[in-house]
């Protein structure tokens, strides 16, 4: 299966340049109550290995669900995503053989009465989905925290997306380094 997610990557919001403008391909996006200016990196991660197989770069204002079906490689039967991917199975580009396991919205989950059997089972199902979805966050941690890639380096989506492809390929090597070294020692 595939786990999908997206992260915001900031772009310089300064207009102190020759043109006196921000990057026209980057856009504003709201996360919680905080506004960001930049791009989004959408990734598809293998649910078993945790390695990235698909990377897409878009403007910051592109909704996650619009990219959901482009992040699938085509051979999976199940896909997981957070609440931002609700409705991915109903989209016109949805693949009929893929079963989507989308997280419940946090506000709806808080309203569950865990003393009732049905709600307790629903909450346990959501916990299981969260455990599977956690693998998609690891490549973001490597790129943003390990290597400090929190702000784009170039103007325009094309160059930045090309750099994202390279960074996520390197993050795959970083995350699989122990398995790769064990293969060399054997």
Predicted regions and their residues:
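Acidic, contiguous segments within the catalytic cores of piggyBac-derived transposases
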Residues: 123, 129-131, 167, 174, ...
């Amino acid at each position: 299966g595939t786990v999908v997610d997206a992260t915001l990557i900031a772009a310089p919001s300064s207009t102190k340049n020759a043109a006196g403008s921000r990057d026209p391909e980057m856009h504003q996006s709201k996360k919680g109550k905080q506004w960001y200016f930049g791009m989004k990196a959408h990734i598809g991660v293998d649910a078993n290995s945790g390695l990235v197989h698909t990377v897409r770069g878009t403007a910051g204002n592109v909704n996650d669900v619009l990219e959901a079906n482009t992040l699938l490689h085509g051979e999976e039967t199940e896909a997981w995503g957070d609440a931002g991917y609700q409705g991915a199975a109903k989209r016109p580009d949805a693949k009929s053989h893929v079963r989507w396991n989308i997280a419940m919205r946090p506000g709806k989950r808080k309203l569950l009465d865990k003393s009732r059997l049905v709600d307790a089972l629903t909450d346990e199902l959501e916990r299981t989905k969260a455990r599977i979805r956690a693998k998609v966050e690891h490549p973001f941690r490597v790129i943003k925290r390990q290597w400090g890639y929190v702000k784009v380096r170039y103007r325009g989506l094309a160059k930045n997306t090309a750099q994202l492809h390279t960074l996520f390929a390197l993050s795959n090597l970083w995350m699989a380094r122990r398995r790769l070294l064990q293969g060399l020692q054997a």
